[in-house]
């Protein structure tokens, strides 16, 4: 046997199997198949395509290819469509009987090879099949692949890479994670997920890619016309497959179902990400902090947290971003587009994922459950954050003060305490903030938005803290009642905290003294009693505080701000606790009476005032009995 047939070394999928692959898997398939074809088409200058009429290299390439030419010359200078088309048109089968089983009425494999390549402009679906014959040059030995009778050649060397698709043998193993592959090209592409190598750069926007097919696919975003338009929302796409995937956001179709838990997904990529939650596999490990990740994309995002790189820059305002997703979110702030609207409350969203998460607020769905304590969560990030409270894992450590954090967002926020960075700026007044939530709260002072409304009196508030303070002014409004002791509360969170007193559930334990707490915030406050840490410093007088809430209250002493005003007499106070104590003068009955004296006429509103009064009376008595 003196020939190698392309189908012998190619991996093909049925139409049903091909539909299950996502874009990344299809790109990988094309890269490997194109590389295989290149190896077959340009092994040597003596190699020819054996067919009726003897199609030579000169017939295919249009010129004689020199011996030192590399495979890259084939792909760079010659159109795929012209090369493959000439091969297909000129090939004739010498032995129809031996190859009858290989003939296909339509070769879907070639369509897939050229699906993402801009050079394949011609339609090749009419070409019946590909049968590349290699004439073995003189002096080259034949190496028979015994299992299937395939013959391979390698000039002046032995066969180094036998075909292993059929046997399942995977001789090429990754030294980082141990994953094995049947082809060396597969391994090379996989290694890039560990070292972060992305050698293919888009000249238009500078974005990098690990594979040429991914780059070609991306370039179409800049150059190709979006001819496939969604009739429901008007959004346009480059190819039909992207439109098909998008339509599922309208129809709600979820064809990918997990066999483990029965959960269904609209996209194959989301389905594969979900399956890893069952296996727990985390092959991508960070060498800086030893944190492991299940997905290469998450791993790359994490690595940027160490380097601080911000390659994505907005041309409108100049703001730079570390992640493309954050950059895309920012760009929509300029356009203001929010295509996803909630039918329940009318709220609109920029992203489909945000819209779906919002829907859980109405449905009450909490799909993420903690196996240790049974607590359920709406969002996966909330679930992961909660899991770390049990394990005590804190991989993010501050180099300046040694404080460790469970989450990168908390770590970045803490670093701003040292650097003084306030990246979130109000465009209306120029005031800057450490956290985005602080900026959002501040923006309500300009927009006059007051989303928190009191059901008792109808008064609205812009901040939840002010709303809770106000609710306490209505003592009869306690709709959340404990079924065990009958105690009532203003909000369900207070009731949940109270219930742990009955169950004695204290999940959060101090490692230094063993004391346990019901809530992680209480544990954090307790830990500071051991460290005596006071990270919050007043820039005016240098006074330091343990808690972030204490610093703004203290700053009011310097600014003179008194935001809490008494409605009865107009007196103002710099903190809410002082206002509450003052309000008792107008509303509360004086329940504490002094029994010392004749008659016991002194009355007080609180026990602390009564004790202070009794101490003063005791000192007077002692001075009378024991005169100096």
Curated annotation (Swiss-Prot):
Protein localization: Nucleus
Entry-linked InterPro entries: C2H2-ZF_domain (IPR050752), KRAB (IPR001909), KRAB_dom_sf (IPR036051), Znf_C2H2_sf (IPR036236), Znf_C2H2_type (IPR013087)
Keyword list, A-Z: DNA-binding, Metal-binding, Nucleus, Repeat, Transcription, Transcription regulation, Zinc, Zinc-finger
Domain annotation KRAB: ranges: 4-77
Keyword Ligase recorded: no
PROSITE patterns in the record: KRAB (PS50805), ZINC_FINGER_C2H2_1 (PS00028), ZINC_FINGER_C2H2_2 (PS50157)
SUPFAM superfamilies registered for this protein in UniProt: beta-beta-alpha zinc fingers, KRAB domain (Kruppel-associated box)
Described purpose of this protein according to its UniProt entry: May be involved in transcriptional regulation.
Protein name: Zinc finger protein 555
Organism: Homo sapiens
Gene of this entry: ZNF555
């Amino acid at each position: 046997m003196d020939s190698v047939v392309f189908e012998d070394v190619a991996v093909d999928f049925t139409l049903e199997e091909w539909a299950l692959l996502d874009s990344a898997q299809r790109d990988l398939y094309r890269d490997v198949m194109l590389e295989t074809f290149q190896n077959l088409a340009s092994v040597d200058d003596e190699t020819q395509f054996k067919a009726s009429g003897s199609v030579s290299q000169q017939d295919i390439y249009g010129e004689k290819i020199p011996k030192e030419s590399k495979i890259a010359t084939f792909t760079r200078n010659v159109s795929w469509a012209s090369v493959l088309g000439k091969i297909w048109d000129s090939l004739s089968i010498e032995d129809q009987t031996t190859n009858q089983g290989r003939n296909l009425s339509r070769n879907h494999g070639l369509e897939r090879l050229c699906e993402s390549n801009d050079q394949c402009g011609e339609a090749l679906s009419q070409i019946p099949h590909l049968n590349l014959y290699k004439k073995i040059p003189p002096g080259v030995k034949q190496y028979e692949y015994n299992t299937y009778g395939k013959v391979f050649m390698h000039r002046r060397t032995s066969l180094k890479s036998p075909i292993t698709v059929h046997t399942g043998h995977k001789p090429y193993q990754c030294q980082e994670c141990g994953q094995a592959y049947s082809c060396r090209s597969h391994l090379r592409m996989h290694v890039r997920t560990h070292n972060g190598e992305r050698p293919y750069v888009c000249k238009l926007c500078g974005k990098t890619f690990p594979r040429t097919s991914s780059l070609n696919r991306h370039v179409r975003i800049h150059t190709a016309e979006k001819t496939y338009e969604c009739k429901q929302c008007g959004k346009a796409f480059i190819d039909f497959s992207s439109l098909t995937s998008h339509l599922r956001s309208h129809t709600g179709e979820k064809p990918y179902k997990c066999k483990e838990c029965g959960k269904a997904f609209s996209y194959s990529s989301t389905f594969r990400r979900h399956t890893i939650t069952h296996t727990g596999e985390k092959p991508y490990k960070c060498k800086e902090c030893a944190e492991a990740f299940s997905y290469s994309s998450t791993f790359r995002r994490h690595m940027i947290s160490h380097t601080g790189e911000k390659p994505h820059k907005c041309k409108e305002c100049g703001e730079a971003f570390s992640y493309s997703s954050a950059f895309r979110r920012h760009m929509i702030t300029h356009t203001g587009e929010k295509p996803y609207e909630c039918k329940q409350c009318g709220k609109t969203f920029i992203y489909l994922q945000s819209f779906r998460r919002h829907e859980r607020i109405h449905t009450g769905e909490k799909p993420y459950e903690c196996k240790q304590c049974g607590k359920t969560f709406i969002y996966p990030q909330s679930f992961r954050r909660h899991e770390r409270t049990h394990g005590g894992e804190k991989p993010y450590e501050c180099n300046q003060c040694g404080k460790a954090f469970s989450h990168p967002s908390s770590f970045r926020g803490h670093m701003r305490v040292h650097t003084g960075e306030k990246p979130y700026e109000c465009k209306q007044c120029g005031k800057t903030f450490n956290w985005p939530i602080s900026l959002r709260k501040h923006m309500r002072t300009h927009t006059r938005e007051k989303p928190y409304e009191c059901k008792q009196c109808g008064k609205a508030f812009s901040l939840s803290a002010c709303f809770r303070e106000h609710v306490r002014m209505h003592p009869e409004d306690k709709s959340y009642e404990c079924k065990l002791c009958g105690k009532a509360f203003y909000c369900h969170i207070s009731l949940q905290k109270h219930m742990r007193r009955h169950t004695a559930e204290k999940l959060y334990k101090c490692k230094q003294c063993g004391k346990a707490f019901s809530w992680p915030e209480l544990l954090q406050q307790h830990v500071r009693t051991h460290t005596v840490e006071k990270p919050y410093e007043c820039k005016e007088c240098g006074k330091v505080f343990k808690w972030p809430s204490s610093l703004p209250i203290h700053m009011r002493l310097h600014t003179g701000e008194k935001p809490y005003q008494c409605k009865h007499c107009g007196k103002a106070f710099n903190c809410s606790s002082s206002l509450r104590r003052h309000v008792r003068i107008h509303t509360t009955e004086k329940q504490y009476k002094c029994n010392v004296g004749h008659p016991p006429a002194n009355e007080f509103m609180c026990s602390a005032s009564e004790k202070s009064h009794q101490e003063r009376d005791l000192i007077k008595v002692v001075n009378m009995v024991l005169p100096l």
